[in-house]
Amino acid sequence: MKKLTIGLIGNPNSGKTTLFNQLTGARQRVGNWAGVTVERKEGQFSTTDHQVTLVDLPGTYSLTTISSQTSLDEQIACHYILSGDADLLINVVDASNLERNLYLTLQLLELGIPCIVALNMLDIAEKQNIRIEIDALSARLGCPVIPLVSTRGRGIEALKLAIDRYKANENVELVHYAQPLLNEADSLAKVMPSDIPLKQRRWLGLQMLEGDIYSRAYAGEASQHLDATLARLRNEMDDPALHIADARYQCIAAICDVVSNTLTAEPSRFTTAVDKIVLNRFLGLPIFLFVMYLMFLLAINIGGALQPLFNVGSVALFVHGIQWIGYTLHFPDWLTIFLAQGLGGGINTVLPLVPQIGMMYLFLSFLEDSGYMARAAFVMDRLMQALGLPGKSFVPLIVGFGCNVPSVMGARTLDAPRERLMTIMMAPFMSCGARLAIFAVFAAAFFGQNGALAVFSLYMLGIVMAVLTGLMLKYTIMRGEATPFVMELPVYHVPHVKSLIIQTWQRLKGFVLRAGKVIIIVSIFLSAFNSFSLSGKIVDNINDSALASVSRVITPVFKPIGVHEDNWQATVGLFTGAMAKEVVVGTLNTLYTAENIQDEEFNPAEFNLGEELFSAVDETWQSLKDTFSLSVLMNPIEASKGNGEMGTGAMGVMDQKFGSAAAAYSYLIFVLLYVPCISVMGAIARESSRGWMGFSILWGLNIAYSLATLFYQVASYSQHPTYSLVCILAVILFNIVAIGLLRRARSRVDIELLATRKSVSSCCAASTTGDCH
């Protein structure tokens, strides 16, 4: 079979991702475009004659970039197309928005690269009474047009057949430009590098005349003639860029008049009706908060009900199983405990996170694909405008519910450096999936039936602190007004199940692999440091270990937030959590289990793997029945019952160490707000600078310590009023001084972002080094 590389390009919300998932299935690889932190996805699929590598290009409305301050999407798409890496392009076009989508199509066809138009979302177009003559459109464009409904898999085989039959586009003159424009474009083309095909040189000439700043990188000496060329043109026409765009839109209008009835189309009645409620100025925000709460409720309840299968099952296989092998094969006791607690305990920490994190990713994917997430940005626009930010900046913040790294990277879609930087500083406060894993464990241990409500309150606290951070920056070192907010709202539709599963799987797989590697390594090292004293001797009591001795010295620093000296394990969790937040659970599980295991002797004669696995399945089944019982549905704030008994195991020790729900909640506040993980810190440094990364770390530590201290000291005020009052006043005074210093430093702060654009050629190469996707 012949190998073929295809670039997949289209407007945002055109169904490009769904088509990519339909074609490639699970055969996908996620990384970054070389030199930039924009995600690059590749997938593999086969046709009758070809083995295809499909490259998913960023969604973009055109290939023209007027300002270097705009997002990188147009630059990356243009660079890849001009690089010659793609043998063929598939342009995904939204049939319900044909006129707008055809602008990008015309630019692609003018380049002369073989192209297939995938006319998607025909089902939505039909509901709006839009009729499109496929053959007529194909004849006018001079390339194959394949009708598709990617959410249902309709037209996929026809698209594969068209790929096998692909050939150069017919030489059809689509756009009739004014003769002076063509003459000057040809004059520029003559002085461009001769290795570029003539048609592409003419296209680059038009792009330069339109004001595209990145086409100059390919133009060679022609870029030096641009100013003189524009001066000559302005003697004949006012604005060359306007004439070029107008010629294209006239061509699009002529095509649409012949092949479709878009002018008489009816808007989606369902979308219009729902938007009257969802976008209502009074109901929009409560609906958004309810949707967020529902997401956490499902993640905690349904994910928690599935947890015994992963928790009890992994204990049976990787903890008790390793212990049984160790005793049976007469391993040394220290080696058996080391393997069971370190390796087995690390695996046992990762696997129980899967159901709850997976449920949250599934729900997020559903909200994104259904079209609701775009509405959430509009709902939050008024609030974001108060911060001096457009509502568009809330979109990357919502992405932060999954992971803060793409949230920081998503700030690139904003136009102004000030808006990008403010959004980057706010992003770490959005509670990610790794934090949900911590919250879920503490919710089951301390908050009983109010577990989901406790988790919801922490997520809302993260949003509130992000908003307050934005306000602080606006009135201190980043004063300014927001740019107007314009964003396309896609039509509501039911997401395709296959696409949902693939998106959820990609996110969950990335989380588990990343978390698993770190947690298992940390668990092994913690087990080692927990087994020896500072003098190097093996200890029987972990409270005499080197880790305990060092941690006890540091723990008093966290006394104001409710961490007592004997709870040194919680201090270790905060330090390891700086690597990755999910490691907090692994650390606490390893250390609390080590303390508990001293009182629990494992008897290999009583070990029965089949019984323990059956117990895991039975407990999961009972939990699912309880979760979907009528009583729970009538009273939805019912915490997960799949986390095990509180009287035994690591959770029992944790309950004793913290001593109260107030201390546990204060600890969670600190975990929510303090230092972001290493991946996020790296993303902040790349997207801004190391200085701003340092500011983000210090500000987060201050907010976390201040808020956790205020909460715990108010909650426990009656126990030690004098100490609590001193702590509260000290925190308030420190923050007043800090904000005052920031106001004075405003004139000396540079809010420009680091230059992140590499050479033209480097952006076309693939990089498989991902951060956190």
From Swiss-Prot:
Residues 3-169 form the FeoB-type G domain. It is a multi-pass membrane protein. The keyword Nucleotide-binding applies. GTP 3 binds at residues 56-59. The keyword Nucleotide-binding applies. GTP 2 binds at residues 35-39. GTP binds at residues 120-123, 149-151. InterPro entries: Fe2_transport_prot-B (IPR003373), Fe2_transport_prot_B_C (IPR011640), FeoB_Cyto (IPR041069), FeoB_GTPase (IPR050860), G_FEOB_dom (IPR030389), Gate_dom (IPR011642), P-loop_NTPase (IPR027417). PROSITE patterns: G_FEOB. It holds the Pfam family FeoB_N. GTP 1 binds at residues 10-17. One of its GO terms (molecular function) is ferrous iron transmembrane transporter activity. The chain crosses the membrane at residues 282-302, 309-329, 344-366, 383-403, 427-447, 453-473, 518-538, 664-684, 691-711, 722-742. GO terms for cellular component: plasma membrane. Its main location: membrane. Keywords: Cell inner membrane, Cell membrane, GTP-binding, Ion transport, Iron, Iron transport, Membrane, Nucleotide-binding, Transmembrane, Transmembrane helix, Transport. It comes from the Bacteria. Probable transporter of a GTP-driven Fe(2+) uptake system. PANTHER family: FE(2+) TRANSPORTER FEOB, FERROUS IRON TRANSPORT PROTEIN B. Belongs to the TRAFAC class TrmE-Era-EngA-EngB-Septin-like GTPase superfamily. FeoB GTPase (TC 9.A.8) family. This is Fe(2+) transporter FeoB.
